[in-house]
Every structure is written in structure tokens, then in C-alpha cells.
């Protein structure tokens, strides 16, 4: 009988269960967990986002797997979950960023951009004939000379973090970050921490072709993706690469 009651609340995303739950939003969070992990680290002089983009098949073209995106020159996003859902939210963020520049002749703040994204996500938790977004985002950037790092949730709730993981193995990676994160670390230290966090749940080590890293530093306020050679160099330096 209890299963039948739950099934009834499953069918409508706009209906709360008697104990105050929105089952479809909870299922969307499960979809995020099925995605490969992404990590964000805020440092004294910038912010780092890193993503595991290893191919699930050797026949997949690596370049077709993209988990880190530039939103504006000072903002980047990493995703975990349904790729198509992520693309739609990234388009929303890019449009809003362009609108802000055209309307106010200045870049959008990282916080306001995040809230625009989460407001859009939230609409899909109370609209009939739609479903929640099965994706979480890390929104990283520089605002008024300060690094900012936010997480979006399928419920439409934004959270600000010093260091955070989304996607598969989130709990294990988050525990690692909580143990290893230190206030005052520089951008290079943030890159190392992000790579070590991803490696902590990968027994075979990391491959430069299967990791994306981007930084936005306070001085230049410019989004920059690390080249594959730069990632390989750091993996070798930190002894995080897989066996040949």
C-alpha cells in the first residue's frame, strides 16, 4: 500500500509527498551521482575547476566529451549529470551574461549569474509537463577582485563553497577535500588539490586525456583551460598518472 502511495507522488513533480518530499527532484539528484565527478577549489588568488571526462568506451572521440565550459571571460562552469541538461543551462547562463553586458555595459557578477541559473532550474520543479534538470553545476569566477565558487542543485538551490565535489563518488571526494583543503593556498596548490581529489577515487590513476582543468585568476580575471601537455606535466610531478 505504501508503495502505491509513493508511486502516486512519483507521477507529479509539483506534488509534495505527505512527508514533504519531491520525489522527482530526489531522482534528479540520483542522476547527478551517475555522472563522472567534477571538483572546484577556491584559492587566495583564483579559483580552479577540474572534471573527470574519461571515455566510457575506447571508440569514443575524447574531444566530444566536454565537461568544463566558458560562460564569460571571467566565469566558467563544470558539470556532472546529464550532458544535454547541462548544455541547456550553460546556454541560459551565456545568454544572461550577454544580456548583462549589453544592458549595463559590465560583466555579470558570479553570484547573480548563479542565481539566474538556479531560478531557471527551480521553475522546473513546480511546472506541470516538465521534469527537473538531472545535472549539477559548479560556477566559478572572479567578482569584485574576489574568487567565488558556487554549486547548483536540481532543486534550484545555490550553495557557495571553498572546495566542493559533484557527481559520482561525491561523498568520498568531499571527505578528501575537507581533510586536505587549507585556507591561503595559491592557485597552483588548488590545481594540485583538485587533481589529487579526483585521483583519490580512481585506483588506476589519472590520464591527461581524461581530465579537464580550468582556472580563473584574480589578477587577469580570465578563464583559461589548461592544455593537455600542462595537465600531463602536473600529473607526472604529483605522481598521479596511471601505469603505462
UniProtKB/Swiss-Prot annotation:
* Stored Pfam families: Proteasome (PF00227), Proteasome_A_N (PF10584)
- Domain of life, per lineage: Archaea
Q: What InterPro entries does the entry give? A: Ntn_hydrolases_N, Proteasome_alpha, Proteasome_alpha-type, Proteasome_asu_arc, Proteasome_asu_N, Proteasome_sua/b
Q: Does the keyword Cytoplasm apply?
A: yes
Gene Ontology biological-process entries: proteasomal protein catabolic process; ubiquitin-dependent protein catabolic process
Q: How does it assemble?
A: The 20S proteasome core is composed of 14 alpha and 14 beta subunits that assemble into four stacked heptameric rings, resulting in a barrel-shaped structure. The two inner rings, each composed of seven catalytic beta subunits, are sandwiched by two outer rings, each composed of seven alpha subunits. The catalytic chamber with the active sites is on the inside of the barrel. Has a gated structure, the ends of the cylinder being occluded by the N-termini of the alpha-subunits. Is capped at one or both ends by the proteasome regulatory ATPase, PAN.
Similarity comment = Belongs to the peptidase T1A family.
Among the entry's GO cellular component annotations, what is one?
cytoplasm
Q: Which organism is it from?
A: Haloarcula marismortui (strain ATCC 43049 / DSM 3752 / JCM 8966 / VKM B-1809) (Halobacterium marismortui)
The alphabetized UniProt keywords are: Cytoplasm, Proteasome
Residue ranges spanning the membrane: these are none
Describe activation and inhibition of this protein: The formation of the proteasomal ATPase PAN-20S proteasome complex, via the docking of the C-termini of PAN into the intersubunit pockets in the alpha-rings, triggers opening of the gate for substrate entry. Interconversion between the open-gate and close-gate conformations leads to a dynamic regulation of the 20S proteasome proteolysis activity.
The molecular function terms in GO held by this entry are: threonine-type endopeptidase activity
What is the protein name stated in its UniProt record? Proteasome subunit alpha 2
Described by its record, this protein's role is as follows: Component of the proteasome core, a large protease complex with broad specificity involved in protein degradation.
Where it sits in the cell: the answer is:
Cytoplasm
Q: Which CDD domains match?
A: proteasome_alpha_archeal
Amino acid at each position: 500500500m505504501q508503495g502505491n502511495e509513493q508511486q502516486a507522488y512519483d507521477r507529479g513533480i509539483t506534488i509534495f509527498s505527505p512527508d514533504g518530499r519531491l520525489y522527482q527532484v530526489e531522482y534528479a539528484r540520483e542522476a547527478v551521482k551517475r555522472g563522472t565527478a567534477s571538483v572546484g577549489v577556491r584559492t587566495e588568488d583564483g579559483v580552479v575547476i577540474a572534471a573527470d571526462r574519461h571515455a566510457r568506451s575506447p571508440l569514443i572521440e575524447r574531444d566530444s566529451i566536454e565537461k568544463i565550459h566558458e560562460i564569460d571571460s571571467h566565469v566558467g562552469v563544470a558539470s556532472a549529470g546529464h550532458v544535454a541538461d547541462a548544455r541547456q543551462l550553460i546556454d541560459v547562463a551565456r545568454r544572461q551574461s550577454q544580456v548583462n553586458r549589453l544592458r549595463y555595459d559590465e560583466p555579470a557578477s558570479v553570484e547573480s549569474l548563479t542565481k539566474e541559473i538556479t531560478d531557471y532550474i527551480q521553475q522546473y520543479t513546480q511546472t506541470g509537463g516538465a521534469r527537473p534538470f538531472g545535472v549539477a553545476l559548479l560556477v566559478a569566477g572572479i567578482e569584485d577582485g574576489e574568487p567565488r565558487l558556487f554549486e547548483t542543485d536540481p532543486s534550484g538551490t545555490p550553495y557557495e563553497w571553498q572546495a566542493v565535489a559533484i557527481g559520482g563518488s561525491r561523498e568520498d571526494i568531499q571527505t578528501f577535500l575537507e581533510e586536505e583543503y587549507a585556507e591561503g593556498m595559491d592557485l597552483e596548490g588548488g590545481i594540485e588539490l583538485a587533481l589529487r581529489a579526483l585521483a583519490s577515487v580512481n585506483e588506476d590513476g589519472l590520464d591527461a586525456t581524461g581530465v579537464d582543468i580550468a582556472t580563473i585568476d584574480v589578477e587577469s580575471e580570465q578563464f583559461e583551460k589548461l592544455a593537455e601537455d600542462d595537465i600531463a606535466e602536473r600529473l607526472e610531478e604529483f605522481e598521479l598518472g596511471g601505469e603505462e
